[in-house]
């Protein structure tokens, strides 16, 4: 458990493992995982107005418009209140980073450096339980029963945006969009970068970093 409030942003390309890393951090340290993608997908499943707007952008491998994401994420942060959290998928541009900085003091920006070729291969093995957003990675985080969610026993599925041609497009867009954001945070001395091909390689280094930060 974190002994003091710890608020971090995690940045990584789609399929880099940032969702899994975020879940591990929160499971081991008692924080809230706030995922832009999960929030948007939940709205798509529920067919809300936000979900209808987001569905087409995600299916085409495009980013959901800035105004929609900013409003949604700041509202969720407000709900979390005075608790530690990991922001996954936000901010994704300088304007969002500035909007976040005006509201919150971020303690660290965690970046995951995973080769794109590894990511494209990895998404072939990623399955989700759509209603909850739980993610399984065959070969690392396997479901107890193949093709079934551990909690509900309901069928798992692959995301529309995990198809190889969509992933390749998203990776190109990620590099273009996120490089300025990482540079912005680097100037503030907040960035910690972790390189590796698999989550199991990155996680031990992550734990050392987190333990150093919370005990500082």
Curated annotation (Swiss-Prot):
Region entry LID, spans: 125-162
Region (NMPbind): 35-64
Single GO term (MF): ATP binding
Localization (cell): Mitochondrion matrix
GO cellular component, one term: mitochondrion
Keywords: GTP-binding, Kinase, Mitochondrion, Nucleotide-binding, Phosphoprotein, Transferase
Assigned EC number: 2.7.4.10
Tissue specificity note: Ubiquitously expressed with highest levels expressed in the abdomen, suggesting a function in muscle tissues.
Catalytic activity of the protein: a ribonucleoside 5'-triphosphate + AMP = a ribonucleoside 5'-diphosphate + ADP
Disruption phenotype: RNAi-mediated knockdown has no effect on viability.
Binding site for AMP: 36, 41, 62-64, 89-92, 96, 159, 170
Principal subcellular localisation of the protein: mitochondrion
Record note on quaternary structure: Monomer.
Domain remarks: Consists of three domains, a large central CORE domain and two small peripheral domains, NMPbind and LID, which undergo movements during catalysis. The LID domain closes over the site of phosphoryl transfer upon GTP binding. Assembling and dissambling the active center during each catalytic cycle provides an effective means to prevent GTP hydrolysis.
UniProt record similarity statement: Belongs to the adenylate kinase family. AK3 subfamily.
Free-text function comment from the UniProt entry: Involved in maintaining the homeostasis of cellular nucleotides by catalyzing the interconversion of nucleoside phosphates. Has GTP:AMP phosphotransferase and ITP:AMP phosphotransferase activities.
Record-given protein name: GTP:AMP phosphotransferase, mitochondrial
Native source organism of the sequence: Drosophila melanogaster (Fruit fly)
Gene name of the record: Ak3
């Amino acid at each position: 458990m974190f002994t003091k409030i710890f608020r971090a942003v995690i940045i990584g390309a789609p399929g880099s493992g940032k969702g899994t890393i975020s879940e591990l951090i929160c499971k081991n340290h008692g924080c809230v995982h706030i995922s832009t993608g999960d929030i948007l997908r939940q709205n798509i499943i529920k067919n809300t107005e936000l979900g209808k707007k987001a569905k087409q952008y995600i299916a085409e491998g495009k980013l959901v418009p800035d105004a929609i994401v900013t409003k949604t994420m700041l509202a969720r942060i407000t709900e979390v209140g005075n608790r530690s959290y990991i922001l996954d998928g936000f901010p994704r541009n300088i304007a969002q980073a500035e909007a976040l900085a005006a509201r919150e003091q971020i303690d660290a920006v965690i970046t995951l450096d995973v080769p794109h070729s590894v990511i494209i291969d990895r998404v072939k093995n990623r399955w989700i339980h759509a209603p909850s957003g739980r993610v399984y990675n065959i070969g690392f985080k396997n479901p107890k029963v193949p093709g079934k969610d551990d909690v509900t026993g309901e069928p798992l599925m692959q995301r529309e945006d995990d198809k190889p041609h969509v992933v390749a497009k998203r990776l190109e867009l990620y590099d273009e969009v996120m490089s300025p954001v990482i540079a912005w945070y680097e100037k503030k001395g907040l960035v910690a970068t972790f390189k590796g091909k698999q989550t199991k390689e990155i996680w031990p280094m992550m734990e050392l970093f987190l333990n150093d930060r919370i005990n500082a």
